[in-house]
Amino acid sequence: DNEYVEPLIQEVYNEIDKLHREPVPMEELTMVRNYMLGEMCRSYESPFSLADAWIFIATSGLDDQYFSRSLQAVNEVTPQEIQELAQRYLCKETLKEVIAGKKLS
């Protein structure tokens, strides 16, 4: 059903505007940070996934501190930094909208 497509797109743009105007609330950042750290840990919990991660590092030309820096970045990012990144990289004028499903009239 397409009735939610336009409201959904508008809500995405509203969230982008909000990120431009105000820093992410600390409670929300903490929730996302915990989720990301948990996902990072889960992706390295088996010998095979850890081997895959090291293969990724080797084939991408990254150094052996890549994982440590990633964890540090997630732990240390501030609401102000996220706002600055949103202002720099989330430009509504350059976004492309892709909609899957029934053709809109």
Regions found by a protein language model. Give the residues of each.
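C-terminal regions of mature proteins
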Residues: L19, E27-S105
